[in-house]
């Protein structure tokens, strides 16, 4: 929870392709360690008024902006896409492999939820927003045709990709920095949740549920636009710590008796981080968490509740409390989390790209000249920052260079 999942993926992609050129719609990251010292080429949106704080307001320009990057000099294009990065233009002799965190959620299956949360369910502004999202959907569906290989960050997202683009995707789980999270066998008597305080994370649901369980203590780490609402819901048994540095978060992840999760996420990094510390997870049983938490079998690492409601969560907490001591082995939680290590991501992603590129070269009747860093050896450089590096935001592209070949990586 030092960076978002997209920044972690970008860092590991650059570790696999350490000479990559990076392209991004905008470039406002304060923490630049994920760039590994690489400079960033940005779109015209970077120079528009208020782009730093209001870049999402330029959504209608995103498709146009991503198509302005001239990547014709590269043989290999990689994109890490939440929205439009997979829409970079490329030719028949280039390989474009896209790591898709999700199809554009606010334009597809979650459109109505996003409009309701934004207060755009009715009225003239609603009509304008729906027209824009219709345009984004059409562009998004067309742009997927320019991708040769699709990777998804979970089976849940792979199903969404299949529904949206009618394409199959290889599942490559995102990297979690389990090496910097330590196992702790003994637990204290409190529950933990940690997240940005935004509507879809449903921290309000968790806090409200604990307000009905005054004998059970909850600690909340994180801040965001819903801070005021959540503070109003919190009873005396709920402690709101706001944003905290990694050391404080790590300490609480280690000591909590369970990590509580209420969001429907594409994957969900924080439940894996909790398990890496030996802490079981109590989660809403929908989305990527169903793949990262084991609720059945000989070595469970958590339990699920079926409905995104206070009553369902309270019932799940009651079930957890009624379980015998030792029902969740901290070492089993840790072992499960290690399935999502950065090293395993690098291995799977490098193999995915290398095999795809070799197949294209065979089709073209050429031998591959691309030099790809083996994932098992792809370690971050000693100094992640260098002069001239630039920050990245939500949409970017990168390309590594070889003496005889060029590669490109695009990120959204």
Predicted regions and their residues:
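Acidic donor-binding loop of glycosyltransferase active sites
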Residues: 254-266, 279
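Active-site donor-binding segments of glycosyltransferases and PAPS-dependent sulfotransferases
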Residues: 16-86
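A charged, aromatic-enriched C-terminal amphipathic alpha-helix characteristic of glycosyltransferases
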Residues: 324-362, 370-374
């Amino acid at each position: 929870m030092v960076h978002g999942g997209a920044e972690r993926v970008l860092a590991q992609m650059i570790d696999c392709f350490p000479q990559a050129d990076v392209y991004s719609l905008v470039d406002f990251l304060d923490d630049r360690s994920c760039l590994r010292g690489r400079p960033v080429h940005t779109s015209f949106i970077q120079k528009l008024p208020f782009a730093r704080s209001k870049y999402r307001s330029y959504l209608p320009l995103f498709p146009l902006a991503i198509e302005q990057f001239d990547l014709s000099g590269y043989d290999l294009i990689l994109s890490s896409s939440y929205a439009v990065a997979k829409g970079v233009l490329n030719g028949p002799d280039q390989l474009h492999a896209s790591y898709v965190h999700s199809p554009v959620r606010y334009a597809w299956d979650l459109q109505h939820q996003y409009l309701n949360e934004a207060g755009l369910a009715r009225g003239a502004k609603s009509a304008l927003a729906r027209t824009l999202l219709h345009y984004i959907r059409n562009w998004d569906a067309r742009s997927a045709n320019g991708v040769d290989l699709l990777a998804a960050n979970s089976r849940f997202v792979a199903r969404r990709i299949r529904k949206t683009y009618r394409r199959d995707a290889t599942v490559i789980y995102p990297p979690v920095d389990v090496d910097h999270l330590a196992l702790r066998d003994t637990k204290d008597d409190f529950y933990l949740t940690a997240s940005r305080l935004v509507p879809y994370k449903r921290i309000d649901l968790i806090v409200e549920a604990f307000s009905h369980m005054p004998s059970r203590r909850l600690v909340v780490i994180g801040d965001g636009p819903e801070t005021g609402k959540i503070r109003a819901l919190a009873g005396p048994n709920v402690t709101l710590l706001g944003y905290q540095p990694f050391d404080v978060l790590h300490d609480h992840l280690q000591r909590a008796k369970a990590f509580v999760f209420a969001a429907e996420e594409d994957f969900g990094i924080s439940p894996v981080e909790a398990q890496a510390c030996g802490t079981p997870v109590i989660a809403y049983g929908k989305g990527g968490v169903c793949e990262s938490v084991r609720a059945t079998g000989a070595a469970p690492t958590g339990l699920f509740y079926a409905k995104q409601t206070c009553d369902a969560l309270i019932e799940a907490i009651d079930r957890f409390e009624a379980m015998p001591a030792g029902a969740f082995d901290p070492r089993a939680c840790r072992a499960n989390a290690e399935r999502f290590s950065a090293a395993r991501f690098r291995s799977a992603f490098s193999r995915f790209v290398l095999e795809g590129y070799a197949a294209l070269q065979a089709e073209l009747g050429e031998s591959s000249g691309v030099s790809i860093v083996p994932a098992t050896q792809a370690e971050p450089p000693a100094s992640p920052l260098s002069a001239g590096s630039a920050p990245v935001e939500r949409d970017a592209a990168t390309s590594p260079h070889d003496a005889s070949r060029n590669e490109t990586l695009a990120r959204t």
